[in-house]
Structure formats: C-alpha cells, structure tokens
UniProtKB/Swiss-Prot annotation:
The gene is ppa. It comes from Gluconobacter oxydans (strain 621H) (Gluconobacter suboxydans). SUPFAM superfamilies: Inorganic pyrophosphatase (SSF50324). This is Inorganic pyrophosphatase. Belongs to the PPase family. Mg(2+) 2 binds at D70. It catalyses: diphosphate + H2O = 2 phosphate + H(+). Catalyzes the hydrolysis of inorganic pyrophosphate (PPi) forming two phosphate ions. GO terms for biological process: phosphate-containing compound metabolic process. Keywords: Cytoplasm, Hydrolase, Magnesium, Metal-binding. One of its GO terms (cellular component) is cytoplasm.
C-alpha cells in the first residue's frame, strides 16, 4: 500500500480518512511499514487486553512523535487492517508515553459510511463507559513492557483535535 497516495480527507479537519492498522478487539499491534507499505506485526500486547476501537492514522500528517497522527475510530463492526475509513473527529485523548506527547484523535465513521453515530458530535456525547474503557486501555496496555509507560492527561474537544490535525498536516509538508 502506498500511503502517500491516500488523501488525508475531504474537508479537513472535519471529514478525514483514517488508515486502519489495528482492528477493534485485537491483541496484536500492527503498523504500516513506512518504506515498503507492508502491514507488519510490531508486537503482541504483553498485557491480556484488546484494542477498544479500530486504531490507525491520518495519512499525510506528521505528529509530534514523528509518526502520522494517531486516530481511533469507533465502529459498529471490526474493520480489516489496511482499510481506509472516512471519519469525523469528535475529540481527542491527551496522553504522554516514554517517547513524549502522543495524542489519539477520537473519531466516528462519517454518516455516509454508517449512521449509527450521526448524533455523536463530541466525546461528551459518548457513553461514559466508552470513554472509561478507552482511558483504561491506554493507561494499562504497556504495563508489562520493560521501559514503557503511558500517562493519560485528559480529554480534549473537537476544536482542539482539529487544531492538532491541522498542525500535523502542516508538519508533513
């Protein structure tokens, strides 16, 4: 897969594309190799936990950690790794890890992809248990890995997520 040929979206930062690397429910961390475009197994999670949502990145972006901007997409079904999904950002999980700042843009499928989340416009519209599950996963998923750690510092609104997306787009140019 040549990620450089995938558009970051139709109406940035409100209508974006997310390349899915990890399906919801996976205990395997996959990554798209920057050089070959192949989907490779980065590692198996050391903790007995599974990703709470589809996980991937926004193509054409460069986040503060030197990788494309990370995104989670809440979906009604598992999405195959390597798929590109049209999504709407609704907020952001703010975190730090052993490598520094590491935000996760929280998204839902665009209404044209599936209407289940058509009334969700902010992370505040999500059930509290969904936010708690996402927070819990990211606070704990590296617990058993040597020299790795994560600190969740809070949630941000759609406007702040949009600012981070636009900064990551500018950084990639």
């Amino acid at each position: 897969m040549d990620v450089s040929k995938i558009s970051p979206g139709k109406d940035l930062p409100n209508d974006i594309n997310v390349v899915i690397e990890i399906p919801q429910g996976s205990q395997v961390k996959y990554e798209v190799d920057k050089d070959s475009g192949a989907l490779v197994v980065d590692r198996f999670l050391f903790t007995p936990m599974a990703y709470p949502a589809a996980y991937g990145f926004i193509p054409g972006t460069l986040a503060a950690d030197g990788d494309p901007a990370d995104a989670l997409v809440l979906t009604p079904a598992a999405v195959v790794p390597g798929s590109v999904i049209r999504a709407r950002p609704i907020g952001m999980l703010k975190m730090e890890d052993e490598s520094g700042q590491d935000e996760k843009i929280i998204c839902v499928p665009h209404d044209k992809v599936h209407p289940q989340f058509s009334n969700v416009h902010s992370v505040d519209d999500l059930p509290e248990i969904t936010k708690k599950a996402i927070t819990h996963f990211f606070e704990r998923y590296k617990d058993l890995e040597p020299n790795k750690w994560v600190k969740v510092t809070g949630w941000a609104d759609k406007a702040e997520a949009g600012k981070v997306i636009m900064e990551a787009l500018a950084a990639a140019k």
